[in-house]
Curated annotation (Swiss-Prot):
Belongs to the universal ribosomal protein uS17 family. It comes from Fervidobacterium nodosum (strain ATCC 35602 / DSM 5306 / Rt17-B1). The keyword rRNA-binding applies. It comes from the Bacteria. This is Small ribosomal subunit protein uS17. CDD domains: Ribosomal_uS17 (cd00364). One of its GO terms (cellular component) is cytosolic small ribosomal subunit. Keywords: Ribonucleoprotein, Ribosomal protein, RNA-binding, rRNA-binding.
Length: 100
């Protein structure tokens, strides 16, 4: 049986070799018939700490790696614009004299 694969957005990368991935799905409401977004968070193994917050990733089901971690990051589909931090140059003007 093939392993399940899901696509989601990284919402946390604070842990070592682990990311939290938010996966959204549409579910039809039983009574009203309207499609409603449902989200679920998965802990996924990121061996090289390559993922950053906001990245769109593909995760795959795996054997249990820890108490909560059962998924592995397979692919980074889209990099976040937030993860690309441009260098900011600051210039400070210091005037030697004082005004009277």
């Amino acid at each position: 049986m093939p392993k399940k694969r899901l696509v989601g957005v990284v919402v946390s990368d604070k842990m070592d070799k682990t990311v939290t991935v938010k996966v959204e799905r549409l579910v039809k409401h039983a009574k009203f018939g309207k499609y409603v977004k449902r989200t679920k968070k998965f802990y996924a193994h990121d061996e090289n700490n390559a993922c950053r917050v906001g990245d769109v990733v593909e995760i795959e089901e795996s054997r249990p790696l820890s108490k909560l971690k059962r998924w592995v990051v397979v692919n980074i589909l889209e990099r976040s614009k937030l993860s690309e931090t441009p260098e900011i140059e600051e210039t400070i003007d210091i005037e030697g004299g004082s005004e009277q």
